[in-house]
């Protein structure tokens, strides 16, 4: 399937690499600034606390619910629709180890009955602060481990300059996606962490395809200009990149629109991550590899000195 028919023309992607790197640097700096100044809106998974899911017989008035909870000592409550307009999820910060989740849940229900007698408790969940801290550390460790493994694999499978470019693109995607959640104040929980790991996998897959084509052209094409070969490789893989991205984005848009509040953050992270991952696989990974000195001679030398499966 072809979206673009270029008639053998090579697009000069790398002519814009300095502009692209400047744009990426600006986004990364803005993301870091927001993360360090504003911070992340960590969810119950990381902060600990109590989540109470309640149901109404009619669509819930979130503004009224927040007002009633504030009047009854729950001013810090986070209230959002959960699955339907009649179900809401109330998230509360930890209130001391001596206060049981059931007690807090009953207090929330009692307060909400002042606004609507039909309210019923669906579910109550408690996460201790120490558990939340452990999950935060383990989540960060999982992401770091994934990046290290990717660096080792790409360096072994291709060439170390490609590995640096691939990991640079992945770090770029992770930082900017996390920065988006910081800027917008969206809740960051385990589902968002899972989405970011999925974005890493998606972006890596695209980067590997491009890197493989660049390596192949370095060996086959009788051109010594590194930039020209990279442009040629990016052009040859462009249709594949666009088809993969567009089909993925269409599914994610459907998930974002009709998936409900439960997976809204997950869909947001994936949707933005696919956009930024597609961009980074074209501009960031290749630009970093060029900066690190990737060349036809380096790749050909690696190919000649490392035995293939047939030689072994």
Predicted segments — roles?
Residues 19, 26, 137, 141, ...:
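Alpha-helical transmembrane segments of multi-pass inner-membrane proteins
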Residues 162-214, 272:
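Hydrophobic transmembrane alpha-helices and their membrane-interface caps
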Residues 221-241:
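Helix-loop junctions and hydrophobic alpha-helical segments within the transmembrane domains
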């Amino acid at each position: 399937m072809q979206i673009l028919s270029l008639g053998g023309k090579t697009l000069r992607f790398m002519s814009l690499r300095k502009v692209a790197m400047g744009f990426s640097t600006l986004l990364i700096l803005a993301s870091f600034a927001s993360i360090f100044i504003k911070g992340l809106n960590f969810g119950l998974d990381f902060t600990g606390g109590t989540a109470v899911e309640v149901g109404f017989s009619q669509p819930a008035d979130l503004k009224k619910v927040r007002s009633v909870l504030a009047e009854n000592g729950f001013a810090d409550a986070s209230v959002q629709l959960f699955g339907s307009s009649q179900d809401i999820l109330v998230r509360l910060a930890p209130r001391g180890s001596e206060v049981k989740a059931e007690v807090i849940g009953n207090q929330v229900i009692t307060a909400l009955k002042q606004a609507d007698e039909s309210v019923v408790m669906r579910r109550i969940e408690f996460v201790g602060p120490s558990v939340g801290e452990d999950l935060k550390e383990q989540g960060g460790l999982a992401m770091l481990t994934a990046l290290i493994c990717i660096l080792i694999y790409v360096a072994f499978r291709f060439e170390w300059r490609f590995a640096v470019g691939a990991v640079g693109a992945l770090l770029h995607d992770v930082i900017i996606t996390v920065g988006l959640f910081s800027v917008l104040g969206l809740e960051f929980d385990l589902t968002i962490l899972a989405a970011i790991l999925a974005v890493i996998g998606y972006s890596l897959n695209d980067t590997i395809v491009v890197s493989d084509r660049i390596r192949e052209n370095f060996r086959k094409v009788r051109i010594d200009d590194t930039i020209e070969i990279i442009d040629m490789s990016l052009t040859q893989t462009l249709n594949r990149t666009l088809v993969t991205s567009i089909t993925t984005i269409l599914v994610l848009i459907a998930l974002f629109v009709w998936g409900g509040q439960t997976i809204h953050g997950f869909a947001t992270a994936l949707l933005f991550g696919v956009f930024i991952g597609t961009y980074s696989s074209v501009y960031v990974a290749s630009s970093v590899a060029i900066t690190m000195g990737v060349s036809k001679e380096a790749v050909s030398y690696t190919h000649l000195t490392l035995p293939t499966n047939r030689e072994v």
